[in-house]
A protein has these predicted regions:
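N-terminal secretory signal peptides
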Residues: 1-25, 46
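Compositionally biased, intrinsically disordered low-complexity segments enriched
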Residues: 7, 16, 31, 48-50, ...
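Glycine-centered secondary-structure boundary/capping sites
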Residues: 11, 34, 38-43, 61, ...
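Compositionally biased, low-complexity segments enriched in small residues
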Residues: 17, 34-36, 63, 93
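N-terminal export signals
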Residues: 23-48
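Structured, non-membrane catalytic/scaffold regions adjacent to prosthetic-group chemistry
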Residues: 46-279
């Protein structure tokens, strides 16, 4: 398995010194080392060797799972990964920020398959921490250049026609840890501020039309989140009228996770993740 933590101080120092000799030389040495490793025969390159006399105990001795009863149905009301996969987690970069409430956690890309990021491993980016908001008390408000200022509850939003779409979201700072130099061991820390999910929600244009928004004179929508930072971003009306922007409540077949905006967030394809305003 790929290492899950940063290089130690000596490793970082060595990488830094090698990088100073020039990027081309650094890459040339890396390829040379890789070629040498490929040319060197190793015992495991052709599969496991035939076990010594007596056989493989993992085959000959029946394990407990082959002889006894396992766990019953609904032992876990909400399924979770195997304990043998416990090393696959979101991780934060030590010292990146002074507080974890205004920081980022990285998705373990090197350990994932396909294009969908499990909701529990989706990268995080917060500006004032995350909250588990009571959906029964949450409100979605529309005002400004509209005929009817509108307030919607979660129940009202979820009764409207919805769509489900796969979208990538990426933080604008993705890969920033290597802008200065190579200093981390896996793509989790270099590219882990990107994730892909199937999002479910109502097109924002539907809600604006309900409120009688002036779609011709209005050029932008100012989206504001309900967290302590009052995160705001402008969204071009051209994106909204295309039907691409969603007011989403679902992620990968279930409700959004609190770390990713539960119970409601914007999905704004094609722009930096900071515009996907949460809460």
């Amino acid at each position: 398995k790929a290492p899950e933590h940063f290089l130690d101080a000596n490793g970082i120092r060595q990488v830094s010194e090698e990088a100073r000799t020039g990027r081309r030389g650094f890459i040339r040495h890396a390829f040379a080392a890789a070629a040498a490793a490929t040319a060197t025969p190793v015992a495991w390159s052709h599969g496991n060797p035939i076990p010594p006399e007596g056989g493989d105990p993992n085959i000959l001795n029946l394990p407990e799972h082959a002889t006894g009863l396992g766990q019953g149905v609904a032992t876990e009301g909400y399924g979770k990964p195997s304990k043998y996969e416990s090393n696959i987690q979101r991780r934060q970069s030590p010292g990146l920020t002074q507080t974890s409430q205004a920081s980022v956690s990285f998705a373990p890309l090197q350990s994932l398959f396909g294009i969908v990021t499990p909701s529990g491993l989706h990268f995080e980016r917060h500006h004032q921490g995350w909250w588990d908001i009571d959906p029964s008390k949450h409100r979605f408000m529309i005002n400004g250049m509209v005929k009817t200022p509108t307030v919607l509850t979660m129940d009202e939003i979820m009764r409207l026609p919805a769509v489900s779409r796969f979208h990538f979201i990426e933080c604008g700072a993705n890969t920033a840890v290597e802008w200065g130099n190579v200093a981390v061991p896996t793509v989790q820390y270099t590219h882990g501020m990107i994730s892909c999910s199937e999002f479910t929600g109502v097109p924002l244009i539907t809600l604006l039309e309900m409120a009688g928004a002036d779609l011709k004179q209005g050029k932008f929508v100012l989206a504001e989140g309900a967290d302590g930072s009052s995160m705001t971003r402008t969204i071009p009306m051209s994106l909204i009228t295309s039907g691409e922007v969603l007011v989403a409540y679902g992620q990968n077949g279930e409700m959004l996770r609190p770390e990713n905006g539960y119970p409601l967030r914007l999905v704004v394809p094609g722009v930096q993740g900071v515009s996907w305003v949460k809460y």
